[in-house]
Amino acid sequence: FFAAPWSPPAWMKSSEKIIGGTLKKGYEKQLAIYLRKFIEAYERQGIPIYAISTQNEPNFVPDNYPGMQLSAKQQLDLTIATYEEFHNPNKPELYTKIWLNDHNFEDWVNADFILKELKKIGKEYYVSGTAFHNYTNYPASYMSQLYNNHPDHEIIFTEHSEWGISGMYNIQKYFWNWSRSYMYWVTMTTYDL
């Protein structure tokens, strides 16, 4: 299993709601502790979490369901806090991988920025990969651009919906551009199926 939070608790957010807003300044450590507790709770139920992204779709703020915007700098700070919480010497170590971005192809520039900043401070190993969605018309080749800049980091395709047979060609494009996975998002809209 992998996990992607849509929103932290309202008290951590500028909107004071799980819908909208961004992470309050200085709350990165609190959110990292929250993510640790989530992973530990699932593990107690026999469900290990292989990887987690720090935020689902960090560049999109839905107005009618939970979500949160995070700038690339906020994602960087949260990623550092999360890794350091998972590997806190005073707590049991968590081996859950951390994935960046978890958003559309054009957002590869945010992941590139974060990975370059981590490399500058010798912490590029804090992240194992970058997760992508495909809900815009930008090319899957952006995943290859990121891979070419950071070949030691995985590319993971974590979310998309396809209609009809066009989906097969898109899935091929994802793998041609270094994705190690494909996750199909399906929402049931009727009980009549």
Regions found by a protein language model. Name each.
Residues 1-119, 135:
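Substrate-binding cleft and catalytic face of glycoside hydrolase catalytic domains
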Residues 44-46, 120-124, 149, 176:
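Alpha-helix termination/capping residues and helix-transition junctions
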Residues 62, 140, 192:
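Glycine/Thr-rich phosphate-binding loops of Rossmann-like dinucleotide-binding domains
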Residues 80, 84-98, 124-170:
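Glycoside hydrolase catalytic-domain groove-lining segments
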Residues 114-120, 146-147, 170-174:
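Mature extracellular/periplasmic domains of secretome proteins
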Residues 157-193:
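Aromatic/acidic polysaccharide-binding cleft in carbohydrate-active enzymes
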